Amino acid sequence: MRNQEIIRKAEMSLSALKSGGLMNPAQASAFIRMVQNTPTIFSESRVIQMENDSQKFEKIGFGQRILRAAQEGKALSNDELTVPTTSTVQLNTKEVIAEINITYDTLENNIEKDGLQQTIMQILAERAAVDIEELIVNGDTASADPYLAQLDGIRKQAVSHIVDMNGEELSRATFKKGLKAVPPKYLRIPQEFRFYTSHGLEVEWKDRVADRQTNLGDQAVQGGLSTAFGVPVKGVSNIQPYTVGEGDAQYDASDIILTHPKNIILGFSRNIRIEVDKDIRSRKFIIVLTAKLDSKFEEEDACAKLINVKE
């Protein structure tokens, strides 16, 4: 296929991605699924496709015992009746924008597979997912970084159960303190929770597990998923270490967040816009993606944050 034919086919494929710049519902849903399927924290979290830029989600739960001793022929008294506790999660999306460049060479390598549109969408999703994860994890409205200042991420939102490790090295006791910090009522199935931390601390824990002369040690060396008290320990690329102290007392530390993956809600507005331009001098297509999103804990009380864990 000649170069001009490739470019014409690429232009047709790119134009099919948009409708006045706005993705149609099917395209938006497909793109959101691609973002969710990337190897980020979203792959396990609860992703909600929002119809509007602002939306409330109801939470219903029973925070106390609902069963009573049954007495034949006698109904429960009024003070024995249980009323569900209700509250809402409010998501208010913030707009984010991304620009990627796809060169003609990239197109030439993919054009004859009859999957160019899918390839472009996949490239967009993979590149956007990492940046979205950075915002959802490290967002801080007090940040000097305009991108991160758009919203408070999960590290900032986790405030109810904070454990300061004061520079202690990672050990089994570290994870034990995290588990004991979360109210027991949430830990009915602890295996479904996750310890999210930096890749450095994940490697440190795998190294400690590998020292054991057991099958778990062998699995850790071979790259298997490590656990602590039955809870998987997962490294997240956007949980980065930070420096604590000064001079000789200075050290690198990181955080560990313990929560259920589905407790992290990522709200994605379906109003996703994609615009395309062509730079003939640089031989590339310029694709600009605009999306709106927000993230919250469904139950902030159901998570713990360990800070100042020595790397």
Curated annotation (Swiss-Prot):
Keyword Membrane (UniProt): no
Keywords: Secreted, Signal
Biological role stated in the UniProt entry: Possibly a prophage capsid protein.
GO cellular component term, pick one: extracellular region
Keyword check for Ribonucleoprotein: no
Family: Belongs to the encapsulin family. Family 3 subfamily.
Main location: secreted
Signal peptide region: 1-9
Gene name, Swiss-Prot/TrEMBL: xkdG
Organism for this UniProt entry: Bacillus subtilis (strain 168)
Superkingdom to which the source organism belongs: Bacteria
Compartments where found: Secreted
Protein's UniProt name: Putative prophage capsid protein XkdG
SUPFAM superfamilies reported in the protein's UniProt record: Major capsid protein gp5
